[in-house]
């Protein structure tokens, strides 16, 4: 049996795994700090854990949806590359949120933000272009 959207499936599975890992760490940090809600009065580890989870949950769905919409007609190598950059950016962002903070954001966080935004721009433009081509 052939899978209809393999690039989307792999991207979604990796993002789901990252969400599970960050959710488990958030619960672990909550248990260690005995914090049911909130950030534990500024507990840096809890904030990092909950934001790494929340930020991924905020960004992954739309990227996955656009990848799924593009996949049936897209060049699989190009779409795989964009999906890989997105996943790499999200992993960098997670590591960046766990890095010790100084006066500026850690490199991983910067790479994660820029990589996520760039893949969003590419996916948005590609999706709109694909829709525009339907009308011609």
Q: What are these model-derived regions, one by one?
A:
Residues 11, 50-53, 82-85, 108, ...:
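Physicochemical signature of membrane-embedded alpha-helices that form the seven-helix bundle of GPCRs
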Residues 54-67, 120-121:
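Core segments of transmembrane alpha-helices
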Residues 124-136:
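Juxtamembrane boundary at the C-terminal end of a transmembrane helix
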Residues 67-89:
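Short alpha-helical packing/oligomerization segments
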């Amino acid at each position: 049996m052939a899978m209809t959207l393999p690039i989307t499936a792999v991207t979604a599975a990796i993002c789901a795994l990252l969400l599970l890992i960050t959710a488990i760490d958030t619960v672990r940090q909550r248990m260690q700090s005995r914090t049911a809600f909130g950030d534990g009065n500024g507990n840096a580890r809890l904030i990092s854990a909950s934001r790494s989870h929340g930020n991924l949950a905020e960004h992954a769905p739309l990227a996955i949806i656009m990848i799924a919409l593009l996949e049936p007609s897209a060049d699989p190598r190009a779409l795989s590359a964009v999906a890989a950059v997105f996943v790499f950016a999200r992993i960098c962002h997670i590591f960046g949120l766990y890095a010790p903070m100084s006066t500026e954001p850690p490199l991983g966080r910067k790479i994660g933000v820029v990589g996520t935004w760039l893949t969003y721009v590419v996916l948005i433009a590609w999706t709109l272009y694909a829709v525009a081509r339907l009308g011609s």
